[in-house]
Design a protein with these regions (language model features):
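Long, contiguous binding/interaction regions
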Residues: 1-49, 56-184
Length: 184
């Protein structure tokens, strides 16, 4: 059997209540688990961007999911990508015990080597943030865990932009505008 591959779907929609539920329902019906989900305003006014990751064995299933999402009336555009086609980042947040960090200088060195930043320090805890790839964020977590200093840990969902010069949604919107103008 073929190995599972991580796919990233970039979905653009109008900011309409209930569209998130409609999009996730497509995955549920096809029994595909969403690994991560990030929703935010896009660079296009009035359009929101959904970055969704899911593991699957079969690219054809991901194509079907993408097409079903794109059929939703409030969805402007949906596309799927592999990691090679995207510039990807996540954010990891770590709350560490300040007394433990102060007792062991190796923890501070580890944070600096990972290019993480200490963003808050008080007598009880210090907050650390790291922006990077999933592996970097989880590797830092496991390294810090060995020092028994982690009080809390979380990482964001993936955010991504395509490596192409123009996103497909821009081409699609330009085409829609040309069609609209040609009908006048």
């Amino acid at each position: 059997m073929e190995d599972k591959k991580l796919y990233t779907l970039l979905v653009y929609s109008e900011n309409i209540a209930g569209i998130l539920n409609q999009i996730t329902a497509v995955f549920t019906r096809r029994q595909v688990n969403i690994e991560s989900l990030n929703v935010s305003a896009s660079s296009i006014p009035g359009v929101h961007k959904y970055t969704i990751t899911a593991w699957h064995y079969d690219e054809r299933e991901i194509i079907k999911i993408t097409r079903q999402i794109e059929k939703k009336i409030d969805v402007v555009k949906a596309s799927y990508y592999t990691d090679e086609q995207l510039f990807i980042r996540e954010v990891g947040l770590y709350k560490l015990s300040t007394p433990v960090v102060l007792e062991n200088s190796e923890i501070s060195r580890l944070i600096r080597r990972a290019d993480a930043q200490i963003v808050e320090v008080n007598p009880t805890y210090c907050s650390v943030v790291l922006s990077g790839m999933t592996e970097d964020i989880t590797n830092l977590y496991y390294a810090l865990e060995k020092f028994d200093c982690v009080l809390q840990y979380t990482r964001s969902g993936r955010i991504a932009i395509t490596r192409s010069t123009v996103e497909q949604v821009s081409d699609f919107l330009d085409m829609q505008e040309r069609n609209r103008l040609s009908k006048k």
